[in-house]
Regions:
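Single conserved hydrophobic/aromatic residue that forms the stacking wall/gate
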Residues: 1-8
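Glycine-rich phosphate/pyrophosphate-binding loops
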Residues: 11-32
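Electrostatically charged, flexible surface regions
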Residues: 30-145
Length: 145
């Protein structure tokens, strides 16, 4: 799953919107994001989303938002990503704490580029991890018995 904010909606094919601010402190200021949250939500209600499509909307941690960019997810990987913790009421949980290794920092059509340049990043997501580019190559392999 690309984003934890959409983790619960995707497995049951609910169309949804996940909003996240690139600030994980309890006193994070969402005020500059609120007009965008309202507008994006209104547009989704007006136009609808196809079944299973989830909009992943991320806001940079700045009061001076430059606008909206429709993006694809950045190609990269998390490094040292999970911290194991014990819940005060029992049990354990894992917190995403690592660093994102961006394999394409200059890709202006990616969400990380948009966020790094002060834009709201809107990425339509879905569950389909098929490697379509590999399908034709596999058809040329001798896989039959």
């Amino acid at each position: 799953i690309y984003t934890l904010s959409l983790h619960d909606a995707l497995p049951i094919w609910i169309s949804s919107i996940g909003y996240s601010l690139c600030n994980h402190f309890a006193d994070a200021d969402f005020s500059s994001s609120l007009p965008y949250i309202r507008r994006i939500t209104e547009q989704v209600l007006e136009h609808g989303l196809p079944l299973g499509i989830c909009l992943n909307v991320n806001f940079p941690d700045t009061a001076s938002l430059k606008g909206v960019r429709i993006c694809r997810q950045t190609n990269g990987a998390w490094i040292n990503e999970w911290k194991r913790s014990l819940h005060p009421r029992g049990g354990e949980y894992f917190w995403l704490t690592g660093e994102f290794d961006n394999y394409e920092p200059e890709a202006e059509d990616s969400d990380h580029w948009a966020l790094g340049h002060g834009y709201v990043a809107v990425t339509p997501t879905q569950i389909d991890v098929t490697a379509y580019g590999m399908m034709n190559e596999l058809k040329n392999w001798n896989l039959e018995v």
